[in-house]
């Protein structure tokens, strides 16, 4: 058998074409064969014999690396080579036939979930909030009043389709239990998972998803006892005792349901946007990516908080300061010009002639267009969503059909997080598909930012003055992260509402004039000759008190 280099150097070694092919086809087949030979030569080959040794010695198989072995370029028909190939094939067969099992003894390793998609189908979404408000109204104590005013995080009860038998370490930050249920309701007090949470745990290997063949009343009795399925899985007898056929029949773990594969979990839990009990593939990929990065992620409320209607456009005009001296009071008594910063004249100069002591009044005259600084730009404003302020916004763009909505609230790992009382989110995530969504318009971005609560800059940035100007502008007063999903490749883009109208740069000019040190006083002249020479007076004055000039030369006797 010729080597690849021989085929390239001597074309005569190429097998002749068949009689049914033409010369052109023969040339093409030879070139194709040459390309395939080169690709096969360059392709990395894994020696599964090296992996077989680690397979038999350690349990942490996933932590080991399959290394490449030495590769023979051709078969030379020896028994040693045939034995090596057979050993590698057997090792590959053992690796591919490995059965992945869950560790039932470890509380952090395994948990079983049951798929009940229609259990919360007709349940009111605000059930917990209604019960909390009712309990606060019936109670008379201060604690009850606080409970009545407390807002619970969104439960999304109609989308919770997976019921957990018990919790483990992986599911401590996932799932919610529906409180306030009647005592005779099955599975009372147990935690339910959203589709993205369940699928994430299945992929992670921490959840075994089962399809129930019995009703939820049989799997999870209403008396709150141990679930029948869990009792069937864990035998009441000890490991050393002999089990009879009757015990094995009673403890049949497949009596109440069947386990589902990962493909079946994807088919049941992945769907279109707005489909109850399912999540889109783009949102699940973003959720899974953030969870694997160590963040805590919860779903955002479907209906955001009510929009404040009292938000109005503000201008950069500042109210006139009150006179603080007799001179300024007398000047203020003089008749003023008919024009004002808020009502400019129809013709003539924007800045009327006069005497101005600061740049503030001049720039207020030049400020004709109103600024769109929201009321959230003030540190005393409420942390509530605002009404979109763009007068040109199209209602159809900011309606329910717009894809630009907040889908997830994200918390850093260092943030103290609880599922029932989560703190304000560190990030607001909007998931966008790069395939189906175009570049957002101004009205869509304005509506998206208006749906997010105010996120003011840090206190030291607000009090930092001009030195912290760029930090305040970069952070903004509202910000949302767009998670652009391009067929599984996720990029994050940050959109913020910058407070440019709040940064009045002309005030810095007044600070320099009024706060700068004064240097002045005319200097005496320099004498020369005898002691009775007289120097001339230098020229003083200037802005802020000028520096005295150099004196003239005196006359001697």
UniProtKB/Swiss-Prot annotation:
Pfam assignment, any one: tRNA_int_end_N2
Region annotation Disordered: where it falls in the sequence: 1-36, 131-152, 225-252, 370-403, 514-557
Biased composition range(s): Basic and acidic residues: 131-140
Biased composition (Low complexity): 370-381
GO BP: tRNA-type intron splice site recognition and cleavage
GO-annotated cellular components: tRNA-intron endonuclease complex
Family of the protein in this entry: Belongs to the SEN54 family.
Protein name: Probable tRNA-splicing endonuclease subunit tsp-5
Native source species: Neurospora crassa (strain ATCC 24698 / 74-OR23-1A / CBS 708.71 / DSM 1257 / FGSC 987)
Gene: tsp-5
């Amino acid at each position: 058998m010729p080597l690849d280099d021989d085929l390239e150097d001597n074309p005569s070694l190429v097998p002749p074409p068949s009689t049914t092919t033409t010369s052109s086809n023969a040339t093409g087949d030879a070139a194709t064969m040459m390309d395939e030979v080169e690709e096969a030569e360059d392709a990395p080959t894994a020696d599964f014999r090296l992996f077989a040794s680690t397979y038999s010695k350690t349990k942490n198989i996933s932590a080991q690396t399959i290394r490449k072995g030495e590769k023979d370029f051709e078969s030379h028909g020896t028994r040693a080579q045939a034995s090596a190939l057979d050993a590698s094939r057997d090792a590959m067969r053992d690796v591919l036939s490995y059965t992945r099992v869950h560790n039932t003894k470890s509380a952090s390793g395994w948990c079983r979930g049951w798929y009940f998609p229609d259990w919360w189908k007709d349940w009111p979404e605000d059930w917990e909030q209604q019960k909390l408000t009712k309990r606060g109204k019936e109670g008379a104590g201060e604690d009850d009043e606080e409970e009545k005013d407390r807002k619970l995080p969104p439960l999304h009860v109609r989308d919770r389709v997976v019921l957990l038998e018990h919790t483990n370490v992986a599911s401590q930050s996932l799932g919610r239990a529906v409180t306030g249920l009647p005592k005779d309701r099955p599975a009372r007090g147990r935690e339910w998972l959203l589709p993205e949470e369940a699928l994430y745990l299945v992929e992670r290997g921490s959840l075994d998803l089962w399809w129930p063949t019995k009703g939820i009343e049989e799997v999870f009795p209403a008396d709150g006892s141990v679930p029948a399925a869990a009792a069937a899985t864990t035998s009441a007898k000890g490991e050393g005792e002999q089990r009879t056929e009757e015990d094995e029949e009673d403890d049949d773990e497949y009596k109440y349901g069947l386990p589902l594969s990962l493909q079946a979990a994807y088919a049941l839990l992945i769907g279109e946007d707005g489909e109850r009990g399912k999540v889109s593939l783009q949102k699940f990929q973003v959720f899974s990516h953030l969870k694997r990065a160590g963040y805590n992620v919860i779903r955002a409320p479907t209906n955001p908080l009510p929009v404040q209607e009292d938000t109005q456009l503000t201008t950069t005009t500042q109210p006139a300061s009150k006179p603080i001296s007799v001179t300024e009071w007398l000047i203020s008594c003089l008749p003023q010009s008919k024009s004002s910063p808020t009502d400019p004249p129809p013709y003539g100069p924007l800045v009327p002639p006069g005497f101005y002591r600061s740049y503030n009044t001049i720039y207020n005259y030049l400020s004709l267009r109103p600024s769109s600084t929201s009321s959230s730009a003030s540190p005393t404003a409420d942390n509530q969503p605002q009404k979109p302020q763009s007068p040109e916004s199209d209602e159809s763009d900011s309606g329910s059909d717009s894809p630009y909505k907040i889908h997830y609230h994200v918390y850093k790992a260092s943030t103290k997080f609880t599922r029932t009382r989560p703190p304000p989110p560190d990030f607001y995530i909007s998931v966008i598909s790069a395939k189906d969504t175009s570049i957002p318009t101004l009205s869509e971005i304005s509506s998206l930012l208006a749906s997010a609560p105010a996120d003011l800059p840090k206190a030291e940035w607000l009090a930092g003055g001009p030195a912290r100007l760029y930090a305040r502008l970069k952070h903004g007063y509202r910000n949302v992260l767009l998670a652009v999903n391009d067929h599984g490749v996720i990029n994050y883009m940050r959109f913020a509402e910058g407070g440019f109208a709040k940064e009045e740069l002309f005030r810095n000019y007044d600070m320099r004039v009024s706060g700068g040190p004064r240097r002045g006083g005319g200097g005496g002249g320099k004498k020369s000759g005898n002691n009775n020479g007289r120097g001339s007076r230098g020229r003083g004055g200037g802005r802020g008190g000028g520096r005295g000039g150099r004196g003239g030369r005196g006359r001697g006797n």
